[in-house]
Design a protein with these regions (language model features):
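Short beta-strand edge/turn micro-motifs at domain boundaries
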Residues: 103-125
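Ligand-binding pocket scaffold of soluble enzyme catalytic domains
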Residues: 16, 65, 92, 113
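Short beta-strand segments enriched in hydrophobic/aromatic residues
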Residues: 28, 87-89, 102, 118
Length: 129
């Protein structure tokens, strides 16, 4: 039986993949913080659910809706979850394939903070430059 926080993250990533942004939003604490490393157009620290949702909309805009996350695994306990996935996208004739790790902090059944880690940040920065 999976940990409830594993289910939470798996459901969120599946909802993101379906474009069900209402379901994605419902998983977030209102005061969520989301950290995207690098220097590209989507890099930065997003404070609050509204800013995070705007960042997701910007990601879809920049990639023409091609961004996808192929989930490999989720590891979870009572306070954290870690998702391992491969991100893929196309933009301006460029293609991105990047193995990514998201580290989630979970509070009261909601995602309260996320740290993204990329295996090839140079490629991600170039893609989103």
């Amino acid at each position: 039986m999976a940990h409830p926080n594993e289910d939470l993250i798996r459901e969120g990533i599946a909802a993101f993949g379906r474009g069900d942004m209402d379901a994605v939003r419902k998983q977030m604490a209102d005061d969520i913080r989301w950290h995207v490393p690098g220097r590209g157009l989507i890099s930065g620290d997003y404070e609050g659910a509204e800013q995070v949702m705007q960042a997701f909309a910007r990601l879809a805009e920049l990639t023409g809706g091609t961004y996808s996350a192929e989930l490999h695994d989720v590891l979870a306990n009572d306070e954290h979850a870690v998702a391992l996935y491969t991100a893929r996208a196309e933009r301006a004739g460029k293609q991105l394939t990047d193995n990514t790790v998201l580290t989630y902090h979970i509070r009261d059944g909601k995602v309260s903070e996320v740290w993204g880690l990329s295996t090839d940040l140079y490629a991600v920065d170039e893609f989103f430059s």
